[in-house]
């Protein structure tokens, strides 16, 4: 008996579109019973299996389809989708490339390939694919949105904004693209525009927790704490387990000085993507702050060097609660910490820690110690130098002993999420260099240290970057300076911990640890804070620094 396979396949396609997978399967099986190598039937069965999350069967069906017809582009595409959904990115990529080799002008294929490359952190490849997608389909808003995200992640803010604006022009009522654009405006300091984007998104979907949290975040950046807390808590009321909202609420409470709630809420950081990558899956229990005189406690620094320097101050308060303390800190400050902090052993990541019974991340100590020790321990200096630390470093530097010696740092870690705001250009410091009686010494390290070479032609800056091989070296130099002027970096924390007079230069949207509107720091008594009065305005800040420096010199 002959059957009309085309009719059966048409019925199968209609059933798939209507979600009637059981009927569609029967039609496909009927075709295969008559013609077991029918490519379309195997392809349809693959799509049905994918809808039902039967990934193994879907892979088998799509593989059969491409084996029967290697030029079946859609089968290659869907095979890639299955691999993508099962986190087999290399296989997904191979399948997409097979599809593209047969249909090189298909924007959907380029977009899917870009997504796979983005997941594999191949940023350049992903950008190229998304650009090809919009080349062949100029109104492909998802591609513009992803391009905006990638440009943002690579610090190309102008391009990020351009792509986000394009996406919004194509999808003006889409909450996702409005949130993307609003987030970029927020990072660039355009808070009113950011708020307008988020409020428009809320008018479209009033209970969207992403939008509510973003709105709270931009109000936090703009220092409107009441509104920041209102929108953040509204998101939590709608979705009590929404991680970003809890994380932002922790920052709101901490910047407000509400340590009681803030340190508790700060534990939500371990649920965020950034912190999950540094989480430790120890079998030993987490220390809760209780007295355990027979136990050995491992305290491990989970964040950056500056955070480690700032929070090792709390270790002293643990001393009388446990038997032994092992402290793990970044290798770059191991020597300083070993000499300064009273623990039984200091190690660096990767070193054998010896046996321990309990553990705790360093920035969880304030929570564990609360409320018995609820204040900020601010006895400084709490770091000191080993007696052999100098090793001729000071004598090798050309010091102008008759002048006031100022160390400067203008840039932090370029990988920091807020680096585009908290770092500045060296050119802003040049206005200080005309003040008579001052010698300037660059303590800058990293890729931005080379900026001093051009500036030194016209300004007398002593470049110490090649001499500073460790934080111990930097600390040695600091002890011979009259003042350190720095943006928010580990160097500023080091200077504060050494009780060196320090002027900290902060962006308008500064980190929670510097609190709100203060010109002093409860962490470091020797520190004075200069703040931007509006986003991105380094000029006014440096005018204040210049005036204060002139006053300091005249009184010295």
PLM features per residue range, with description:
Residues 1-483, 488-556:
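Alpha-helical solenoid repeat scaffolds of the TPR/TPR-like class and their adjacent stem/linker regions
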């Amino acid at each position: 008996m002959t059957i009309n396979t085309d009719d059966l396949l048409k019925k199968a396609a209609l059933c798939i579109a209507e979600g009637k997978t059981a009927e569609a399967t029967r039609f496909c099986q009927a075709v295969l019973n008559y013609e077991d190598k029918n490519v379309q039937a195997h392809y349809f069965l693959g799509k049905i299996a994918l809808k039902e999350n039967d990934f193994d069967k879907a892979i088998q069906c799509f593989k059969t389809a491409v084996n029967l017809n290697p030029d079946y582009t859609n089968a290659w595409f869907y095979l890639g989708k299955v691999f993508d959904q099962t986190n087999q990115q290399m296989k997904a990529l191979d399948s997409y490339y097979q599809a593209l080799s047969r249909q090189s002008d298909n924007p959907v294929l380029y977009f899917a390939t870009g997504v796979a490359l983005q997941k594999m952190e191949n940023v350049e490849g992903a950008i190229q694919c998304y650009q090809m997608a919009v080349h062949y389909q100029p109104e492909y808003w998802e591609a513009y949105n992803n391009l905006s995200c990638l440009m943002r992640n690579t610090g190309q803010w102008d391009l990020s904004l351009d792509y986000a604006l394009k996406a919004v022009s194509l999808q003006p009522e889409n909450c996702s693209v409005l949130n993307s654009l609003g987030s970029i405006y927020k990072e660039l300091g355009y808070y009113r525009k950011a708020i307008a984007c988020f409020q428009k998104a809320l008018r479209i979907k009033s209970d969207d927790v992403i939008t509510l949290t973003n709105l709270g975040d931009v109000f936090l950046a703009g220092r409107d704490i009441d509104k920041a807390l209102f929108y953040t808590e509204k998101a939590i009321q709608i979705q009590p387990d929404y991680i970003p909202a809890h994380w932002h609420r922790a920052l709101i409470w901490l910047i407000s000085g509400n340590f009681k709630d803030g340190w508790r809420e700060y534990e939500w950081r371990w649920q965020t993507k950034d912190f999950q990558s540094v989480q430790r899956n120890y079998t030993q229990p987490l220390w809760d702050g209780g007295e355990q005189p027979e136990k050995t406690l491992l305290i491990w620094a989970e964040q950056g060097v500056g955070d480690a320097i700032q929070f090792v101050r709390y270790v002293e308060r643990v001393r009388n609660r446990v038997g032994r303390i092992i402290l793990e800190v970044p290798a770059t400050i191991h020597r300083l910490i070993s000499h300064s902090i009273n623990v039984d052993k200091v190690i660096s990541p990767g070193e054998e820690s010896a046996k321990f019974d309990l553990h705790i991340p360093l920035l969880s100590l304030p929570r564990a110690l609360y409320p018995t020790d609820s204040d900020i321990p601010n006895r400084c200096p709490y770091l000191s130098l080993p007696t052999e630390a100098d090793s001729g470093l000071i004598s090798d530097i050309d010091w102008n002993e008759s002048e006031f010696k100022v160390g400067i740092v203008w840039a932090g870690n370029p990988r920091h999420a807020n680096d585009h705001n908290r770092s500045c250009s060296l050119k802003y410091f040049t206005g200080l260099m005309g003040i008579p009686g001052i010698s300037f010494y660059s303590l800058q390290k990293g890729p931005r240290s080379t900026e001093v070479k051009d500036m030194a032609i016209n300004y007398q800056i002593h470049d110490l970057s090649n001499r500073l091989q460790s934080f111990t070296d930097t600390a040695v130099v600091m002890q011979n300076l009259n003042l350190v002027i720095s943006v928010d970096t580990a160097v500023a924390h080091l200077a504060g911990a050494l009780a060196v007079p320090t002027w900290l230069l902060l962006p308008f949207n500064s980190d929670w640890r510097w609190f709100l509107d203060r010109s002093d720091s409860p962490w470091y008594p020797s520190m004075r804070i200069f703040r931007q009065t509006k986003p991105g305005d380094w000029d006014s800040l440096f005018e204040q620094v210049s005036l204060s420096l002139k006053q300091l010199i005249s009184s010295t």
